[in-house]
């Protein structure tokens, strides 16, 4: 509402630009290993990620979860804030008119408690981030254990406006898995 809404939109735009800058910069590293070997550690996208957005800051929370996940190459299925789901559908219209390929961002609205369980149990979802109360995060971890889904939970209130807490390399790292390639060299 009013100034708060304007600040949230400004912060969301800033966050989108931040992660757009990372799209071609999140690279792997190489390590020298004993015995004439080199190891390449390459981050790869998790695949299909489920994102359960926070109830507070519906736009900024959505952008804070979606942007890092797609910046490193994932496809996302998003459960937006149940309090303001139209913010997510409006954001989707922005993505639809951009260069974003169809199907990269998928938004499902409805009863949060039912959708969370189904998303956590779904075998085609490879990773799941949950921004909700402690009980919901615990439930997501429990339902995701059936197919060893990678999970990351944010329980309790988080200041989504603070870039030190809600953006950065930790989000990019959690959206990838590292593949190590061992290469022998020398004589």
Please identify what each model-predicted range represents.
Residues 47-48, 102-105:
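Short acidic capping loops at alpha-helix termini that bridge into adjacent secondary structure
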Residues 73, 105, 119:
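Residue-level signal for inorganic ion chemistry
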Residues 1-37:
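N-terminal Rossmann-like NAD(P)+-binding subdomain of aldehyde/semialdehyde dehydrogenases
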Residues 67-70, 118, 143:
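Hydrophobic/aromatic ligand-binding patch that stacks against planar heteroaromatic rings
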Residues 111-115:
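Short helix-initiation/N-cap motifs at beta->coil->alpha
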Residues 31-89:
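Substrate-binding/gating loop at the entrance of the active-site cleft, primarily
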Residues 125-126:
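Short acidic amphipathic segments
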């Amino acid at each position: 509402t009013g100034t708060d809404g304007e600040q949230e939109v400004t912060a969301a735009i800033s966050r989108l630009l931040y992660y757009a800058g990372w799209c071609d910069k999140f690279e792997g590293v190489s390590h020298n290993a004993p015995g004439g070997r080199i190891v390449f550690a390459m981050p790869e996208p998790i695949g299909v990620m489920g994102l359960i957005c926070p109830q507070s800051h519906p736009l900024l929370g959505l952008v804070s979860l979606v942007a890092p996940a797609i910046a490193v190459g994932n496809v996302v299925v998003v459960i937006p804030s149940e309090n303001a789901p139209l913010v997510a559908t409006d954001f989707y219209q922005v993505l639809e008119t951009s260069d974003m390929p169809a199907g990269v961002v998928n938004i499902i609205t409805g009863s949060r408690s039912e959708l969370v369980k189904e998303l956590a149990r779904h075998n085609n979802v490879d990773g799941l981030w949950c921004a909700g109360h402690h009980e919901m995060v615990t439930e997501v971890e429990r339902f995701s254990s059936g197919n060893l889904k990678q999970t990351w939970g944010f329980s309790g209130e988080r200041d989504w406006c603070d870039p030190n807490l809600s953006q950065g390399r930790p989000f990019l790292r959690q959206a990838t898995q590292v593949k190590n390639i061992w290469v022998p060299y020398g004589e």
